[in-house]
Amino acid sequence: MNDRLEEATLYLAATRPALFLGVPLTLAGLFMMFAGFVIVIVQNPLYEVVLAPLWFGARLIVERDYNAASVVLLFLRTAGRSIDSAVWGGATVSPNPIRVPPRGRGMV
């Protein structure tokens, strides 16, 4: 029972997310959608100058931790939208819908 464990090299590129101009693709996609939304609503592309500090701020944060954007998005998916935290004393991923459909919960 003296078997050697197999050793394999895990490269850093295999552990970090794909980046676009220094920002993870999920965050870059959100920024691009926000830029399109600004153009449609305001109809002036000069307001997209606001996007540059956000992009470089996200880039500085991602330089320290590649998964920081994923952690924030995960927080927004769980605790950020938890409406019953006062009832349960913390964030829960509740399987119950906010509104009950008129036909019940699929029993009839």
Curated annotation (Swiss-Prot):
Subcellular location: Membrane
Keywords annotated in UniProt: Crown gall tumor, Membrane, Plasmid, Transmembrane, Transmembrane helix
Transmembrane segments: 22-42
Membrane topology classification: Single-pass membrane protein
InterPro entries, alphabetized: T4SS_VirB3/TrbD/AvhB
Keyword Glycosyltransferase applies: no
Transcription in keyword set: no
GO cellular component annotations of the record: membrane
Pfam families linked: VirB3 (PF05101)
Role description: VirB proteins are suggested to act at the bacterial surface and there play an important role in directing T-DNA transfer to plant cells.
Family stated for the protein in its record: Belongs to the virB3 family.
Protein name per UniProt: Protein virB3
Top-level taxonomy: Bacteria, Pseudomonadati, Pseudomonadota, Alphaproteobacteria, Hyphomicrobiales
